[in-house]
């Protein structure tokens, strides 16, 4: 496996079209686009890495996998009264669909859906308490207490997050939010600003590899049926309106973030994290997707067969 990971890294290093870093969040715009990291953690707990696997990056929307997991733990199926389970087909920050569907977001991975999930997790707690809870959970699944929120990225997002504020106010106008908009947004922007390495992120995804149990720690995180359903949502909705393309090319449940990261799950096989800051036109990591495409070709890990 290390040879496969190393060969993918060397191939990605040689590619010149690396996409473009997200420029609408100032703190992300200054990230070096030439960085690349890939980590594979197998079901048995073996770790294979190449590139900048110890470099922290902003996980952004990948955090929505963890907040969704938490919300389902708190609310169970009642969550689905607040957010749908269908692919959107629209950009991740689109307001059009939200208007047509009465303020109920299409799925928990688009921005409006993740804002609704953040509201659900809050209950009636303050953002500070909720964020401590989210951070505790991410540290738990990664088995790493050093994971933290990058406050500079969070502030950068809050200063440039007008579209997300519009989404939240729009949902509030339909009485879809329980908490004040500013508090929900503060929670949302901060959990998107969690920083992790690919090694930490791949470890954090391990519970989705083994039917809800992290074999590295022996801890059950979610029931078996819930792990399966989270994976199904990642497959259908994890790459916004590029989810079909990702399923076609890679064939794994995955969740991307505009920081250039992707968490991909090969059920029964491995948790994979890749980071390359340059994005394609939809907003997913360009080389990250290409690297995962190479990985499944080499391993036969696509859920659709060899």
Swiss-Prot record:
Which lineage is the organism of this entry classified under, starting from the top rank?
Bacteria, Pseudomonadati, Pseudomonadota, Gammaproteobacteria, Alteromonadales
- The UniProt annotation places substrate binding at 61, 111, 157, 164, 188, 240, 258
Q: What's in the keyword line of the UniProt record? A: Hydrolase
Q: What is this protein called?
A: Glutaminase
Signal peptide residue numbers? none
Report whether Transmembrane helix shows up as a keyword of the record.
no
> Encoded by which gene?
glsA
What does it catalyze?
A: L-glutamine + H2O = L-glutamate + NH4(+)
Recorded source organism is Pseudoalteromonas atlantica (strain T6c / ATCC BAA-1087)
What InterPro entries does its record include? Beta-lactam/transpept-like, Glutaminase
The family assignment reads: Belongs to the glutaminase family.
Question: Which BP terms from GO are recorded?
Answer: glutamate biosynthetic process; glutamine catabolic process
EC top class, in one word?
A: hydrolase
Instruction: Cite the Gene3D superfamilies for this sequence.
Output: DD-peptidase/beta-lactamase superfamily (3.40.710.10)
Write one Gene Ontology MF term: glutaminase activity
| Cystine pairings recorded for this chain | none
Q: Does the keyword Hydrolase apply?
A: yes
EC identifiers of the protein: 3.5.1.2
Q: How is the subunit organization of this protein annotated in UniProt? A: Homotetramer.
